[in-house]
UniProtKB/Swiss-Prot annotation:
Belongs to the UPF0102 family. Disulfide bonds: none annotated. One of its GO terms (molecular function) is nucleic acid binding. This is UPF0102 protein RL0336. InterPro entries: Restrct_endonuc-II-like, tRNA_endonuc-like_dom_sf, UPF0102_YraN-like. PANTHER family: UPF0102 PROTEIN YRAN (PTHR34039:SF1). It comes from the Bacteria.
Amino acid sequence: MGDSDLTAIRRKALRRGRISEYVAAVFLMLKGYRILALRHRTRLGEIDIIARKGDLAVFVEVKARHGEAAAVDAVSVAAQKRIRAASDLWLARQADQARLSQRYDIVAIMPGRLPRHFLDAF
């Protein structure tokens, strides 16, 4: 496989990831969440979606897979640590940080199915 083939595969994966994040964001909005950030980057890592519902800040990892179990399993312990570290940086910048609760969710995006929202996944 040549470099251009790998680049095309990578571009396709990035595009699929972005589309999945937008689908997950719309899904969360329909469930009453307010989307604060998509693909929030910090020096410690990236958070796919930061959402809020009342005094609850939700940090969401989005995974596009063929099944729910594969999506949940795709969020490694290392990724969980990076997301938690990045969320700590985000929380530190919030004026109402003291009253915010936090939760870490996963949204699984699967072909031909509605998204599946795993609350408090890690």
